[in-house]
Amino acid sequence: MKKIALTALAVFSLAASAAYADVVKVGVIGPFSGPFALQGKNFKAGIDAYMAEHGNKVGDDTVEVVYRDVPQADPAQSKALAQELVVKEGVQYLAGFYFTPDAMAVTPILKQGNVPMVVMNAATSSIVTKSPYVVRTSFTTWQTSTPIARVALDKGVKKVISVVSDYGPGVDAENAFKAAFTDAGGEVVEAIRMPLATNDFSPIMQRIKDSGAQGVFAFLPSGPTTLGFMKAYVDNGLKSSGIQLFAPGDLTQESDLPALGENALGVLTTFHYAVSHDSPENRKFVEEARKAIGNPAELSFPSVGAYDGMHVIYKMIEATGGKKDAAKAVEAVKGMEWVSPRGPVSIDPESRHITQNIYLREVAKADDGTYYNKEIQTFEKQGDPGLKAQ
């Protein structure tokens, strides 16, 4: 059955170029319903913002986006939807992928289907190693977790306990922080891995208090789990007792800040993007993306990965003249440089991963009473240290 499915992809890839010469379809897989629907909504806002700014045509070709919903991480469903998009819908590009397992599951069909994949969020370093047709426009957990170790040490914190969700990006975050922290003389006194479904964090908070650590490094996927963790951090007295919290920016994404409120004030994170980033490119992007998403408070980081993902896809379409040629499409964007809403970025010609600035941010309160991530330091031109650790 697997051989038949792959053969169908190969046969269809030959016919698709002729059948869809003037329409180039982009298949986007992400969570558009369920507990992570806001992340899918941000994918769509970023895509809509890009197309509002640049139109829906590349040369003589019209770009059409086809969406498929995977509410929670489901590798089997993601692979089935990707096959359906390539075989039945005739998409020439696959994109999106909020969850790492979903992106991993789709990589085996890329070569046979002659289709590139543009990862707009999924953050495990090794995704780009699974196929030469994968390009990433988001970030990796290694990329955003490494600088925060330096920040903790600069704050005088020498002993830290690590707490992460037990899945690919969580393990990456744990390893990234530990490598950078211990190499610089710090000590990770304990490393806790929590099941993804964890919703009672009180026992974890007690272990943190009992560990004797001066600080806690935390990584959880953005959404309901981060809200629960932050509430427990405050309610169990860790914040008031001076145990400092350090994390990559998933923990304080903008769409969660209204719910986190005072609990998040002063929390330090390192990340590739903040909605508050001060640049002409970002102000223009935020204006369009907020129109697209409807509720301005819901705009968050997946939107910029999607926006830049479409920028890369448009370049691929231009380079191939709208024809279906995954190898040529990917080759065209290796080494590509541009100024993104997040700052200067480029696609590494070897890894096909995005090189970008990582920003130290502190949750602050604006004059109008809203909360935002205030950028206070820049780590320039950060690649992905996780690829060297593979």
Curated annotation (Swiss-Prot):
What is the official name of this protein in its record? Leu/Ile/Val-binding protein homolog 6
Leader sequence range is 1-21
Task: Supply the InterPro entries for this chain.
Answer: BCAA_transport, Leu-bd, Leu_Ile_Val-bd, Peripla_BP_I
Instruction: Give the matching Pfam families.
Output: Peripla_BP_6
Family to which the UniProt record says this protein belongs: Belongs to the leucine-binding protein family.
Q: What is the recorded function of this protein according to its Swiss-Prot or TrEMBL entry?
A: Component of an amino-acid transport system.
Matches recorded under PANTHER family: LEUCINE-SPECIFIC-BINDING PROTEIN, PERIPLASMIC BINDING PROTEIN OF ABC TRANSPORTER FOR NATURAL AMINO ACIDS
- GO aspect biological process, one term: amino acid transport
Give TM segment ranges. none
Q: Which UniProt keywords apply?
A: Amino-acid transport, Signal, Transport
